[in-house]
Structure formats: structure tokens, C-alpha cells
Amino acid sequence: MALAAASILFAPAQQQQKVIGFMTDFDVKDDAVGICKAVMDGVAPGVRVIDITHQSEPYNIAMGARFLAGSAPYFPKDAVFVVVIDPGVGSTRKAIIARSRVGQTFVLPDNGLLTLVQDRDGIVEAHEITNPAWMIGSGISSTFHGRDIFSPAGAHAARGDDWTQAGSVLDVSKLVRLDLHNATINTTGLHGQVIGTDGPFGNLVLNVPAETFAQLGYKLDDEVPIDLAGKHYAFPFVKTFSDVPVGKELFYIDSRGRLSLGINQRNFSETYKVGEGADLTIPKK
């Protein structure tokens, strides 16, 4: 799924240490996130860590890839990202550090989390993290690489250490990629998919960029028919939730420039029992 070119990138951080964007699926009910941040501070005292989220759906690499690509443009051009959504922890999957064409650095498992960043920004160089000096030390856990590998490596990069010393160079064309794609249009209309829900609100996020939806010919206030998860509906296309009464459905373009489905002050996903992975078709007008 391609994303629009990043255009919101801020200037490099003014302090010597770089900002770290930290994202996991750990939740915050136990001490895992705090431990990782303590490790970062131990390597790079006073480092500024911005929590992107720690409630990405467990094991959902595609969701993590979407959150990472969506948040990266709002960080400095020299920011470091530590991302731990790692169902393959302790296996043969690689721990990597990579640099985008923009200049941002990513420390994460090689499991597809970089797919959308690579599509939009390009990855110019990547290394496997094998240098013990970039890890927590001896006794690396087989189940907590967030603490033992990714956090210290990210902190080393943030404090300005030469990130190419983290380990052996990798062929960026062979980094693991997810099969993420945008909706397609043919003679019968648009064919797409639900790629997630919008936090606790239950709005459906679709793999339909605004410019793709525009090709169907619908205008604001049009009723848009849709076959969703095998059932047929029609909802108005409007600018925002308040354009329809409370409890009524709507199509709208979300803050990331994607077509979405919602209900004003209600949860669409729960109401219609539809979630990530559901197929959809929208005919041309």
C-alpha cells in the first residue's frame, strides 16, 4: 500500500542527541515499556523518547507498518525509531538498523514493519545488529529483544554513534516486505479492503487513497453504494461526522487521506461486525 510522499518533516533536532520515536505492542499494564526506556536512558542519558503507541494490536505487523509510516513524517529528519512488534522474537529473523533517504533511522525486526516507509521514502542502507557493543551485554533474552537489542541499539544511534558499526551490511532489496497494496479499479468498479479500525471509535480504515476514490466520480453529499463483507449498503459521502445526524453512517476522507467509513458518535465496526481484512467493492458512479 503506497503512501503519499512525506512533506511534513521537521528540521533536525537542535540538541546533540536525536529524538527517539518508540512504538510497541507491549501495552502499558506491566513494566516492559518502562524498562526499555530506562535502557535507552542508560545508554544515552537524557535522550528524548516520544511514545508513538504501545497499544498496536499484538503481533499485527501490518498495523505497525501503517502506524510507523503514518507517524514518521511528523518527526525530525534525523529521528531514530525503535519499533518492537515482533512475533518472531528469538527466531532466525534479523534485528536490523536502517536509514531512509529522508535521513531517519529505524531499529526494528526485519519482519515487514518497514514496508510502507520503504515504499514512500526509500531505504538507502541497512545493517543487521550483531555487534555486542550495541546490545545490553551478555545474557541476551530469547523473548525480550525490545530490552536487550532494539532499545540499546536505538539509543546508541540517537546519541550519535556510528550506526554502520552495529553489524554487517544487508541488501536492502532483500528486506522482508509485507504484501500491502491499495485498492484497484477495473470495469466493475473499485475493489479494496478494510485495513484497520480507527482506535476506540470503530471507524473502518480502507485501503482507498482519496485520489483513487475520486476516480469513481462521486462528489460530496452523494450516496455511495458499497458491497462490504458480502452485504450491500449505501452511505453518504461527506466532509465530517457532524454532516450527518448522530447514529447515521458516513463515508469521509480521514486525516491520512484515505477513504473511511464511520457512524457519527457510534462504533461502525461493532455495529456491523466488520473489521480488518473485510473485502469491499464500490461501483463507478
Indicate residue ranges for each PLM-predicted region.
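Bacterial Sec-dependent signal peptides at the C-terminal "C-region" and cleavage site
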Residues: 3-16
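N-terminal signal-anchor module of multipass membrane proteins
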Residues: 21-28
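Short, solvent-exposed amphipathic alpha-helices that sit
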Residues: 32-40
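A conserved acidic, glycine/proline-rich C-terminal tail/linker
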Residues: 205-271
